[in-house]
């Protein structure tokens, strides 16, 4: 159920923890998590105590609630959820209100961050913005990263309608930081709403087309214009420049050293976004819509020029697979199709193979279990994509097999 009335009531019953926090509220079709990860890492590098609320999680629900870059522990999370359960039960008994899962996790995040006395909370929307549970807060800055066709059954069937929903995070007099690659139709809607609310609109400069790839202590970084990040691809250059705009504003408003904070961008990590585990020859990427496929293809060509890839792909039944797969076919030597382990219907691997063969009959396609596909010996680099949920499954399998010294 979308809406804010019961979210406000839930927060009131748990003591309004949001009033103790300074929020940076981030919406967007793609890039929310990466932009948030840049900001969280930079603020922590400046010496601030940070909270970072994001979704979905990949392996453990604790990942949604990061305090100083570390997932909250089970005991603290259970304590917060117990308090929320008591409030939710009372709301159901007294008013017939049924608190949703996302409302509960959003309230838990506010409780946990307030309890940890976080200086800043990086606060990611779940879906849309206007009616999203995260939107009950009054932030110190708002951010909209990108707009594309997604969740059409909830947000609308045009870019303009989706932009209107995302623009719901804009608050009176609070500056909006807007991604550079916003479509014109979306920009018009968002700028009009910002003007109504007397909110200034700030955009970063264009990201450079190219960057230099360097390796430090076995970790690949891209560098450009004196900046350095582990996150690969032009889209991550765009996300970093957007985060940098926000950080510069925060440094002016809250009087901290911008240069020291900005050095934290180099430490930012965001799992299943062009992630390569130590000693692995597999790229894990949660790309799940046609726009993401274009970004993935572009990044593969930039980081591994001239290479072909063996793709492992699985997705949900409601996704636009044709456009996604068409984008990847020119880079593919083969596709292995897997089912996503979820209560949501998964796209049938045989249907996916038929889709590929309809426009690329020469490409090898097969079906396999995820574990088998990951372990298969192939002559080319493997790329796992199609769903963040699928990446979570794969990373969970890897966690059982070896220690991974990275957050996911």
Give the predicted meaning of each segment.
Residues 4, 9-19, 45-137, 153-155:
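ATP-dependent carboxylate-amine ligase catalytic core
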Residues 20, 115, 120-125, 132-143, ...:
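Nucleotide phosphate-binding/pyrophosphate-handling subdomain across enzymes
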Residues 26, 34-51:
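A conserved segment at the C-terminal end of the G1
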Residues 53, 178-181, 193-216, 230-234, ...:
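Beta-strand->loop->alpha-helix junctions that form or flank phosphate-binding loops
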Residues 105-154, 187-227:
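Extended acidic/charged loop-beta regions that coordinate divalent cations
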Residues 181-202, 217-218, 281-282, 325-383:
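C-terminal helical cap/extension that packs against the catalytic core
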Residues 388, 393-408:
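Glycine/aspartate-rich loop-and-adjacent alpha/beta segment that forms the canonical ThDP
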């Amino acid at each position: 159920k979308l809406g804010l009335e019961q979210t406000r009531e839930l927060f009131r019953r748990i003591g309004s923890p949001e009033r103790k926090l300074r929020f940076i509220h981030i919406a967007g079709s793609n890039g929310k998590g990466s932009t948030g990860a840049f900001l969280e890492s930079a603020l922590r590098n400046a010496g601030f105590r940070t909270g970072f609320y994001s979704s979905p999680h990949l392996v453990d629900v604790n990942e949604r609630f990061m305090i100083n870059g570390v997932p909250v522990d089970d005991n603290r999370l259970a304590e917060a959820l117990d308090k929320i359960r008591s409030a939710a039960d009372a709301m159901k008994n007294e008013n017939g209100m049924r608190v949703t899962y996302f409302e509960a996790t959003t309230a838990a995040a506010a409780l946990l961050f307030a309890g940890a006395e976080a200086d800043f909370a990086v606060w990611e929307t779940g879906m849309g913005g206007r009616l999203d549970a995260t939107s009950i807060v009054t932030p110190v800055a708002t951010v909209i990263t990108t707009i594309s066709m997604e969740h059409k059954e909830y947000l609308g069937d045009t870019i303009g309608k989706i932009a209107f929903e995302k623009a719901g995070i804009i608050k009176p007099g609070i500056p909006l930081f807007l991604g550079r690659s916003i479509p014109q139709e979306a920009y018009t809607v968002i700028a009009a709403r910002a003007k109504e609310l007397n909110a200034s609109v700030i955009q970063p400069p264009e990201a450079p087309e190219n960057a230099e790839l360097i390796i430090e202590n076995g970790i690949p970084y891209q560098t450009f214009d004196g900046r350095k990040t582990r996150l690969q691809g032009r889209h991550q250059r765009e996300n970093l420049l957007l985060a940098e705009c926000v950080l510069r504003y925060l440094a002016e408003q809250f009087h901290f050293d911008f240069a020291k904070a900005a050095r934290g961008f180099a430490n930012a990590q965001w799992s299943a976004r062009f992630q390569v585990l130590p000693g692995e020859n597999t790229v894990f990427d949660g790309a799940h819509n046609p726009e993401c496929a274009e970004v993935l293809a572009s990044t593969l060509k930039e980081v591994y020029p001239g290479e072909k890839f063996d793709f492992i792909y699985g997705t949900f039944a409601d996704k636009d697979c044709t456009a996604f797969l068409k984008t990847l076919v020119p880079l593919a030597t083969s596709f292995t199709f897997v089912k996503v382990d979820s209560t949501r219907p998964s796209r049938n691997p045989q249907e996916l193979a038929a889709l590929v063969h309809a426009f690329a009959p020469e490409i090898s396609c097969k079906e396999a279990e995820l574990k088998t596909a990951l372990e298969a010996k192939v002559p080319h680099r493997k790329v796992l994509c199609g769903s963040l949920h699928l990446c979570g499954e794969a990373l969970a399998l890897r966690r059982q097999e070896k220690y991974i010294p990275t957050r996911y």
